[in-house]
Amino acid sequence: TRYCSSVNKQGELSSWTDKVRVVPRTQRLIPPKIDEDVVAVIYDALLNNRKFLGSYLKRGMRVSKEYPVSPLGLVFRDGVTYLVATLREYPDVRQMALHRFRNAERLDEGIKSPKGFKLDHYINEGEFDYPEGDFINLEFKARNFVIQALRETPLSHNQGIRPFEEGWVIVSCRIKETQQLRWWLLGF
């Protein structure tokens, strides 16, 4: 939305940022503070396909470590901004919370992107749902009031809903086993 405002300051899009919001479905948490200077370096590196040297504090650690980082994309989830990236020369893709970067310095070296990497594919494969296993056959009993929500926004393309007892239905589908699925099921 910032892009739309800057491109069209006087036109129809100038008030776009005042009219669009993303609201989390979960309990709202206060977003973590992110160092503006660090973010500026990371965004610049991402836009220009350049590496940066990042000092990153992993969760549960007391001391940060420095890594050459190849930024591949940004994902915004529940008030937290994640950098999707590779570290050093390794091809494995990582998720790094921006607020955990303590320092960032631009490097004059192009990024190392895994062959065929696409951010949408990475997300659609469930990497942000914290995979725990393979696909499972899920079947659960739910009250009728859940039916409309699951018809409008199904769990998977092969989801089925069939009547059960008075006021209940059986929902079935084949879906990847993830922590996110467990959290969702526990929400009922």
Where are these regions (language model features)?
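Flexible linker/loop signature enriched in Pro/Ser/Thr and Pro/Gly
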Residues: 89-122
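Beta-strand-connecting loop/turn residues
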Residues: 79-80, 99, 109, 166-169
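Bulky hydrophobic/aromatic content
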Residues: 1-57
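Loop-centered beta-sheet repeat module
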Residues: 40-87, 94
